[in-house]
């Protein structure tokens, strides 16, 4: 009896590990429409590919999932690519990062911010800071508490990139928003930034960090996520007082190369005028 129970337990554990390795490569490609109140008609249909949390350089399938996401993004019309941090976990992933970012060719450019793994603000003792020049040489615009303005069909689109090193001063990001811009987008690694921003600070906020929990346990009351238990917005689209928030589950894994009930994700957001 004990041997049979041990054999069943061993087989179950092996199946879970095998599935978790498979799921870490099983990228979900999403097309989502985001209805924004007051969006100018000239900006209706603007497309943004949101990518996050590559965690390149680790012993994992992270580079493979990023390659698939880049290939998917390159096959679709895209105006802007937004990358919301944790690009690298080890410097040995720099060549993979350069290849991936340089292969992206959106109409108006690739814009990125750094995450906690990029600047060693992490529990990972082996994490190495990301060299900003690597991101820039690949063709991305790296935003660190600064903004750029784009002219899109005669309308002004402002993209603000926040640096998490602001710590308790995240609310100051609202001061970077241009009230005259027709569309204000914030790129920030942590979704919790919406708790610190004033009402209607931005029209659209893009974040990552949480990996959708990365490893989740199913229960009768829903999934229990083993990381960041106090998080309010785990994944997907949310209407918050600070602005419309999209949280990406990201493409990579951290600490362990597994995902369970939290597939990696690449999303193309199509902006629409609410009530059109």
Annotate the PLM regions.
Residues 42, 46-141:
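Membrane-embedded segments
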Residues 52-56, 85-87, 116-118, 146-147, ...:
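Active-site metal-binding loops of divalent metal-dependent hydrolases
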Residues 1-42:
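N-terminal membrane-anchoring alpha-helices
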Residues 122-140, 146-147, 152-188, 192-196, ...:
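Binuclear metal-dependent hydrolase catalytic cores centered on His/Asp/Glu-rich metal-binding motifs
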Residues 29-36, 97-99, 142-146, 171, ...:
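Alpha-helical scaffolding within the catalytic cores
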Residues 33-60, 162-188:
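Mobile, glycine- and charge-enriched loop segments
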Residues 36-49, 140, 147-159, 180-183, ...:
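Beta-strand-turn-beta hairpins that frame and shape the catalytic cleft
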Residues 191-270, 276:
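Conserved beta-sheet core of the metallophosphoesterase superfamily
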């Amino acid at each position: 009896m004990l041997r049979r129970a041990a054999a069943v337990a061993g087989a179950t554990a092996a199946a879970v590990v095998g599935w978790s390795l498979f799921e870490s490569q099983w990228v979900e490609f999403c097309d989502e429409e985001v209805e924004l109140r007051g969006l100018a008609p000239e900006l209706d249909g603007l497309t943004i590919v949101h990518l996050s949390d590559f965690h390149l350089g680790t012993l994992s399938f992270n580079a493979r999932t990023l390659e698939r996401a880049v290939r998917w993004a390159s096959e679709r019309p895209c105006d802007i690519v937004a990358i919301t941090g944790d690009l690298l976990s080890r410097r040995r992933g720099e060549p993979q990062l350069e290849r991936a970012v340089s292969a992206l060719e959106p109409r108006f450019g690739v814009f990125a911010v750094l995450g906690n793994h990029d600047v060693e603000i992490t529990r990972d003792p082996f994490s190495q800071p990301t060299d900003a020049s690597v991101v820039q040489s690949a063709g991305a615009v790296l935003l660190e508490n600064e903004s750029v303005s784009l002219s899109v069909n005669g309308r002004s689109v402002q993209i603000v990139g926040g640096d998490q090193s602001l710590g308790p001063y995240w609310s100051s990001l609202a001061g970077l928003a241009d009230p005259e811009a027709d569309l204000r987008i914030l790129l920030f690694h942590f979704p919790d930034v919406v708790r610190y921003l004033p009402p209607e600070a931005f029209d659209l906020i893009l974040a990552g960090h949480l990996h959708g929990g990365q490893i989740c346990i199913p229960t009768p009351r829903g999934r229990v996520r083993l990381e960041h238990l106090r998080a309010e917005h785990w994944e997907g689209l949310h209407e918050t007082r600070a602005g419309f928030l999209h949280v990406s589950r990201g493409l990579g894994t951290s600490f362990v190369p597994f995902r369970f009930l939290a597939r990696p994700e690449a999303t193309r957001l199509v902006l629409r005028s609410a009530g059109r």
